[in-house]
Each structure stands twice: as structure tokens, then as C-alpha cells.
UniProtKB/Swiss-Prot annotation:
Pfam family, one: Ribosomal_S18
Name by which UniProt lists this protein: Small ribosomal subunit protein bS18
Function comment: Binds as a heterodimer with protein bS6 to the central domain of the 16S rRNA, where it helps stabilize the platform of the 30S subunit.
Gene3D superfamilies per the UniProt record, alphabetical: Ribosomal protein S18
One GO CC term, this protein: cytosolic small ribosomal subunit
Annotated organism of origin: Cupriavidus taiwanensis (strain DSM 17343 / BCRC 17206 / CCUG 44338 / CIP 107171 / LMG 19424 / R1)
Length: 92
């Protein structure tokens, strides 16, 4: 049975070329010490909404589960009060 020895050089090169390899994510709300996410803070909420109007998942943004639930509720409240659009078809 033959074993293939892998070089560290090839491993590093593969990680740089891999499109799924990203830098370590962190929770912006934990770093800032936020206790409650406000639905009136539209600039922050827009950072967590994609181009098509969908809420970006926590696995992509790095947001903790506690803050992701608050963020979800805040975005839905802002949409209900017409502060944010539901879809990307409602551009200003």
C-alpha cells in the first residue's frame, strides 16, 4: 500500500485558491456591546439584507444566534412599518 506525502506548500496554495475559504467571521453586535437591536436603525439593518431583499443568514455574516433572532425581528418590524422594502423591486 503506497502513501502519498502531502506538502504544506500545496495545502496553503489550495486554501488561497478555494473560493469557499474565507476569513474568520465575528459578531459585530458582540464586539460593539449591543444589548438590543433597534428596528429604526436602518443603516445597520440594510447591511444584513441581500440585494434581492432576503435576510442574510448567520452562517455568512457571523452573527450569534441571540442577535440573529433580534435582527430577524427588527427587519420584519421595519418592513411592516414600510421603513424597509420586502423585495428588491421596490427601489427608491
Amino acid at each position: 500500500m503506497a502513501f502519498v506525502k502531502r506538502d504544506n506548500k500545496n495545502k496553503k496554495r489550495f486554501q488561497q485558491q478555494n473560493p469557499l475559504f474565507k476569513r474568520k467571521r465575528f459578531c459585530r453586535f458582540t464586539v460593539a456591546g449591543v444589548e438590543q437591536i433597534d428596528y429604526k436603525d436602518l443603516d445597520t439593518l440594510k447591511d444584513f439584507i441581500g440585494d434581492n431583499g432576503k435576510i442574510t443568514p448567520a452562517r455568512l455574516t457571523g452573527t450569534k444566534a441571540h442577535y440573529q433572532r433580534q435582527l430577524d425581528t427588527a427587519i420584519k418590524r421595519a418592513r411592516f412599518l414600510a421603513l424597509l422594502p420586502y423585495t428588491d423591486l421596490h427601489k427608491n
